[in-house]
Amino acid sequence: MKEVDENSNVELFEVKLKPILGIEPKVYVFLTTIILLLSLISTLIIIPKFKNPGAYLKINSNIENTYIYLNEKYIGRTPLNKYINATEGVLRAKRMGFKTYEQRIKIHNKFFGNYSLQINLELVDPEKIIKQRQKELSIMVKIKNINENTKLIPVFSLISSELKEHPKYIKKFLKDSIPYLNSTEMFKDFLNSYKAIYSIDQDNSNQEEIWNSLKTNFDLENRAIFWFLENLDKDLKILTKNAPWVKTLAKTLDNENIQLISKNEKINIKLPGFKKINSNKIEKIQNYELNSLDSKNISLKSTYNVKEFLIQEQNVTKYEYQDFLKENPKWALNNKENLIKEQLVDENYLKNFNQIGLNEAITGISYFSAIEYANWYSKKLPTGFKARLPISQEWELYQKEPNKNPLNINEISKKVGFWNLMQNSSFNEIAIFKNEKNFYSENSNFYSLITEIRTYSQQNNNLLNASTKASFLKNWSSPNIGFRLIVSKE
C-alpha cells in the first residue's frame, strides 16, 4: 500500500445548502431546531400530562391557615391555590383543636383544570387551642425590647380567627388574659380583637370610651384603670394620664380598700414537719404615680382574709422527693428526655441530684414537677385536705415571725433553694374584677410564672425583701429553685 505523504495537499469539501421553496437555509435550520426541541418537550412533558394532567387545587376553609396534606405530604395552608400533578389521593386538612377533615379526591383528565374545595372544620377541643394560646401569650408578654428583628405572635388575632364561630370562647380568653397582660405590643393586639368581638369601630381611639366598654363587658373594678394605663404605649399613656376623666377617677380611688374574704376552716390535723398558721388578714398596698409633677401617689389597698393552713418549715428534701420518684417513674431522671420533649422540665432537671445530700432541699425541679409532687402528697392526706404550693399572702403570715438566721444578700451566690415556687402566676395583685375575690385560684395554662424570693422579714438594707419577685417559665429547672407545701381544706 502506498503511504500518503504527510505534506501532500488535502482537498477540503464544503457542502452548501440551497434554499428550499425560497426559504433561506439559516431560517429553515433554525425552524428545524425549534421543532426538534418542541418535540422533545412534548415527548417528555406534555404527552405525559395528557395522560396525567393534574390540576390547580383551590382550597378554602372556615378557619384561615388550615394545614393541607395530600397523600401525607404537606402542600400548603388555606387559602390554597397550588398546581399538583397527582391524579388521585387522600386530602387531609388539619388545625389544632379541630377534627381532621379527610377526603379522597380524583383529578379528572382535564389539562390545566381547577379542583375547588370548601372545607368546614368542626371544633372539637377549644380548650386545647386556649391552652396553647395562653402559653404563647405568657411568653410574648416577657419580650420587652421589640425591634424590626422581633416578631411577636399575634395571639389574640389568632384565637379570634380560630374561634370566630364561637365568640363565647374568645370573650372568656380576653377576660382571663387581663391579669397577665403587661405588654404594650400585646395590648394593641388585645384591643384589636376586643373591638372586633364587641363590634367596636377599629378606628375608635377615644380612650375613655374604650375603658368604659372594657369595664362594662369584663366587670372591672375602677382601680383596673391603672392596669389599662400601664399597657398603653408611652406617648398615649402620658396623654391619657393627663385627661380630666382619668384624674377625676383616680382621686376617687386613693386609699380605696377592697376586702377579699374567704370563709375560715379550722385545721384539725397535725403533720410532721408542718407548722400551723392561724387565720389572719394581710394588707397589700400598691402605689401608682399619676402625674410626674404631682408628688402624691395614688395608693390602692387590698385586704386578704387568709384561711388557716399548715406550711412545711423547710423545703422538700431529696429524701422526700425520692419517695415521689419511686411511685412516679415518669418524673425519674432516666425519663428526662421525654419530659423535656413534653416541655415539663428543661435540661437542668435534677442535674445535681447525685451531689445533693438526702436531707438537703431538692432543687433543679420545675413548677410542673412540684405540682405533681403536691398532687401525689395529697393522696396521703386525710379526706378533705389537699396539698399545694403557697400563695403570697400565706408566705407573709408565715414570715411574720422573725427568723434567727435570715439570708444575707451577699450569700446568695453560695446558696441554693432560695427561690420558692408559688401557686399563682398573675402579674397583678390588685383586685381588678368585681365579684371575683377568690385569691386561692389554681394556676392556669399561662406558661410564665411569677415567683418570689422568700427569705424572712427585712431588717436592714443588707437583707433581701421578702416580696422580691421574678418571672420565668414553668418548665425551668434551675438549681436555685426549690419548693415547700401548704396543706389546707379542699
Swiss-Prot record:
GO terms under cellular component: membrane
Compartments where found: Membrane
Main subcellular localisation: membrane
Stretches that traverse the bilayer: 27-47
Pfam families: FGE-sulfatase, PEGA
Topological relation to the membrane, as annotated: Single-pass membrane protein
Keywords from the UniProt entry: Membrane, Transmembrane, Transmembrane helix
Gene3D superfamilies per record: paralog of FGE (formylglycine-generating enzyme) (3.90.1580.10)
SUPFAM superfamilies, A to Z: C-type lectin-like (SSF56436)
Protein name listed in UniProt: Uncharacterized protein BB_0032
Species whose genome carries this gene: Borreliella burgdorferi (strain ATCC 35210 / DSM 4680 / CIP 102532 / B31)
